[in-house]
Each structure stands twice: as C-alpha cells, then as structure tokens.
Swiss-Prot record:
It comes from Saccharomyces cerevisiae (strain ATCC 204508 / S288c). Residues 97-100 are annotated as: G3 motif. Residues 29-302 form the Septin-type G domain. CDD domains: CDC_Septin (cd01850). Keywords: Acetylation, Cell cycle, Cell division, GTP-binding, Membrane, Nucleotide-binding, Phosphoprotein. GO terms for molecular function: 1-phosphatidylinositol binding; GTP binding; GTPase activity; molecular adaptor activity; phosphatidylinositol-4-phosphate binding; phosphatidylinositol-5-phosphate binding; structural constituent of cytoskeleton. The modification N-acetylmethionine is found at M1. The lineage of its organism: Eukaryota, Fungi, Dikarya, Ascomycota, Saccharomycotina. The modification Phosphothreonine is found at T216. This is Cell division control protein 10. It is a peripheral membrane protein. Residues 179-182 are annotated as: G4 motif.
C-alpha cells in the first residue's frame, strides 16, 4: 500500500477529536507571550502597549520628565507580568520595558544590557532543557517580539539605531514602529517610511516577518503586504473621546482629534492585526525554532569543543607522565 494514500475508516473511530483535546489542553495551560519595547523616552512606548492589549499593563512617565529616567546611565530592564483572559483564552504576558535606552549624552553600547538580557533568557531555558529531570513545562521567558521605536523626525537612522538594530535583529524578532507619528503629515510619513525601508535594505537588517519554504502563497503575500507598511506609523491612547456623537479611542490636539483606530490617520490597526491576530503564534515559534535554536546549537558546539580540549589535554598529560 502506498504510505501516502488516504484511507477512510469503515466506521467512526474518533481520532478527529484530537483537535478538541489539544484545544482543551491549551486553554487549560494558557499561552505565554513576552514582548519588549525599545526606544527613547517620550515616544509613547507604554501607551502603545496598553492600547494594543486594551489593558493598563505598564505605567508611563509623564512627557519627558527627567525625574522618571533611571538614576544610573545605563539601559535597565523593567518587567511587568499580567494574565489576560479573552473568550476562555488565557494569555500570560510579560512586557519588558527598557528605560534609559538612548536617553543620555553618551549612548554608546546602550544596546548591550538588552542583548545580554535576551541571551540570558535563552541560556536559562537551555539549562532547564539539559537538566537530568527537566520540568514538563519549562517556563518561557524568551523574548518573542521587540517593538523598536523610531523618532518621528523624518531623518535617516541614527548611529544608535543602526548599531542597536544590527545586534537585535540577529537574536530576536524586531518590529520597527514610528512613535507618535501624528507629529508628521501624511506625506511626511510616506517619505519617512520609504527612507527607513531603504535604510533597512542598506544595512541588510533581518526585520520580522521572515519568509520560508514552508509558507503558503497566501502567507507569503501577507508577509509582503506587512513589509510594505513597516515601520508602522503608530499612535496610542488609553482614553476614549467623543467627537460629533462618535466615541473612539484617541486624543484631542489643538487642531483636531486623533482616532487611533482610523487607518487613514495611523497604522495602529495594521500593527494590532499583524502582531496579535495573524502572527502571534509565529512570533513564539520563530523565537524557538530560529533564534533559540541558533543559540542552542552554538552553545552545544562550544561545550563539545571544550570537552574535547580537556580530553586532549588530559591525554597529553598522561603521555608526559609516562
């Protein structure tokens, strides 16, 4: 019999319920998602996260209040942990903020604490995997996505952005966004996006999403459409305002009102659709299969080489003693 042939059972067996069994287990366990925000203060990082998940997950500094900045002149890691429930689906979310990034006169190597943190999470996961009696479900603290905030200044990438993106895109799924994009006109926004896309190509950054041979034509087309929008021009708001009898999430300015859910005013809806509704699971899987696997392979090779070196040294020592 052809091993690939399809056979219809003569009567009902019941293995079609496996999807229900998987769903039940996943609903019971919940999903883990770890998202990091990187960018200078005053770009609306906290507000955007809270707007994306329609929940107050992290506090934000008011404006550019210097007192809200870290005392030490280094990038810090501030982690907020929450559980969100929507229609029986439980999402365990860690939001990793990086206060201090790019906020000082000397920002050289501001990315190093971020890179160190990401690698440490991979290392912790690997250690738990290699223990003799490992946990059935290893707590996953690996960073699944990084929202990287760019200044809405219409200029080329800064040296800090270039150096940070070069390193972060090698070890994590980076999604660039233009913070507080309502400070730009629509034409300025379009020109700025094209400029930044050219910069990404110039520096050969591996911006998420990635294509692979496993993707269908429909999925490849979706990725192409997403890449045409990156960096997302975003505006966030936790407040509801009313204009002409219509209530929406947004904020009022001196001249007009910004509706964050209006695709003609910003890309918030597109970012939410991409990040949460179409690519959330892929972000988690890509972190595991690409970024973590690469780290794991390098670590295991290094361990093997160290073991071989010690073995060779031991054999040489015995030979000398003889």
């Amino acid at each position: 019999m052809d091993p690939l042939s399809s056979v219809q059972p003569a009567s009902y067996v019941g293995f079609d319920t496996i999807t229900n069994q998987i769903e039940h287990r996943l609903l019971k366990k919940g999903f883990q998602f770890n998202i990091m925000v990187v960018g200078q203060s005053g770009l609306g990082k906290s507000t955007l996260i809270n707007t994306l998940f329609a929940s107050h997950l992290i506090d934000s500094a008011t404006g550019d209040d210097i007192s809200a900045l870290p005392v030490t002149k280094t990038t810090e890691m501030k982690i907020s942990t929450h559980t969100l429930v929507e229609d029986r689906v439980r999402l365990n979310i860690n939001v990793i903020d990086t206060p201090g990034f790019g906020d000082f006169i000397d920002n050289s190597k501001a990315w190093e604490p971020i890179v160190k943190y990401i690698k440490e999470q991979h290392s912790q996961y690997l250690r738990k995997e290699l223990t003799a009696q490992r946990e059935r479900f290893i707590t996953d603290t690996r960073v699944h996505a990084i929202l990287y905030f760019l200044q809405p200044n219409g200029k080329e990438l800064s040296r800090l952005d270039v150096e940070a993106l070069k390193r972060l895109t090698e070890i994590a799924n980076v999604i660039p966004v233009i913070g507080k994009s309502d400070t730009l006109t629509l034409d300025e926004r379009t020109e700025f996006r094209e400029l930044i896309q050219n910069e990404f190509e110039k520096y050969n950054f591996k911006i998420y999403p990635y294509d692979s041979e496993e993707l269908t034509d429909e999925e490849l087309e979706l990725n192409r459409s997403v890449r045409s929008i990156i960096p997302f021009a975003v505006v966030g708001s936790e407040n509801e305002i009313e204009i002409n009898g219509e209530t929406f999430r947004g904020r009022k300015t001196r001249w007009s009102a910004i509706n964050v859910e209006d695709i003609n005013q910003c890309d918030f809806v597109y970012l939410r659709e991409f990040l949460i509704r179409t690519h959330l699971q892929d972000l988690i899987e890509t972190t595991s299969y690409i970024h973590y696997e690469g780290f794991r392979a390098r670590q295991l090779i290094a361990l093997k080489e160290n073991a071989n070196s010690r073995s060779s040294a031991h054999m040489s020592s015995n030979a000398i003693q003889r």
